[in-house]
């Protein structure tokens, strides 16, 4: 019988570990590219783009094996930290849309610092974990920031809710109104969509006006579907 040496076992384990990390990075890449479309023009656009760069560099490092610029022992921590980046961005888009702009500015900055640390080949595992903890603490801190008042100028995050409503309305219109309902119904709904786009593009529109436009557009769609 052949005797399996510790070196062979370690090599197999390392290969399995590298394969698992590569699969995780592929998943992260898909998630980040999906998020990218939703954060254009926001405080999260830069960290998302840099996180995508991190994924590609780590994938290259895993393929390069011993030639990597990263310490192989630290790659696992970097991959784990990328998951924390994705979770932090998701948290921000879900919970900070109605907060004052500073909440998103601070959160975007904190996430960017974490991504930079992941990218830094000289960053230690401890320093990466410390930055992850800083981001988690920041999540709790920004939740205490004031909410936007109805009379405050709408932020890009407030407007994103209207933007989604516009796209959803267009999609439903093309599927259930166009060539299904009479032209008058189609035309009336189009006017409501055009008005909503005007509100969204208005740099001085208030939170209250955006919220009201969402309600108006939803009502226009329901009327068209009757």
Swiss-Prot record:
Ranges for region IgG constant region-binding: 37-100
GO molecular-function terms, A-Z: IgG binding
Summary of the function given for this chain in its UniProt record: Protein B belongs to the group of bacterial Fc-binding protein.
This protein's name: Protein B
GO cellular component term, pick one: extracellular region
Keyword field: IgG-binding protein, Repeat, Secreted
The Sequence repeat ranges on this chain: 158-168, 169-179, 180-190
Biological source species: Streptococcus agalactiae
Cellular localization per UniProt: Secreted
Superkingdom of source: Bacteria
Pfam assignment, any one: CAMP_factor
InterPro entries, per the entry: CAMP_factor
């Amino acid at each position: 019988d052949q005797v399996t040496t510790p070196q062979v076992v370690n090599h197999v384990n390392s290969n399995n570990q590298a394969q698992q990390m590569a699969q995780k990075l592929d998943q992260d890449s898909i998630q980040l590219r999906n998020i990218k479309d939703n954060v254009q023009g926001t405080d999260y656009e830069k960290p998302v783009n840099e996180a995508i760069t991190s994924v590609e560099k780590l994938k290259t490092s895993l393929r390069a094996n011993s030639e990597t610029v990263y310490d192989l022992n630290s790659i696992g921590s970097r991959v784990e930290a990328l998951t924390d980046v994705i979770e932090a961005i998701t948290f921000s888009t879900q919970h900070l849309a109605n907060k004052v702009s500073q909440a998103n500015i601070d959160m975007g900055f904190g996430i960017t610092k974490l991504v930079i640390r992941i990218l830094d080949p000289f960053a230690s595992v401890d320093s990466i974990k410390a930055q992850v903890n800083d981001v988690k603490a920041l999540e709790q801190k920004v939740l205490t920031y004031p909410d936007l008042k109805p009379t405050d100028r709408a932020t890009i995050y407030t407007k994103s809710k209207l933007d989604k409503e516009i796209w959803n309305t267009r999609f439903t219109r093309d599927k259930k109104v166009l060539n299904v309902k009479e032209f008058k119904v189609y035309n009336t709904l189009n006017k409501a969509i055009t008005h909503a786009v005007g509100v969204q593009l208005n740099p001085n529109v208030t939170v209250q006006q955006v919220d009201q436009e969402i309600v108006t557009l939803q009502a226009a769609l329901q009327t068209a579907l009757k």
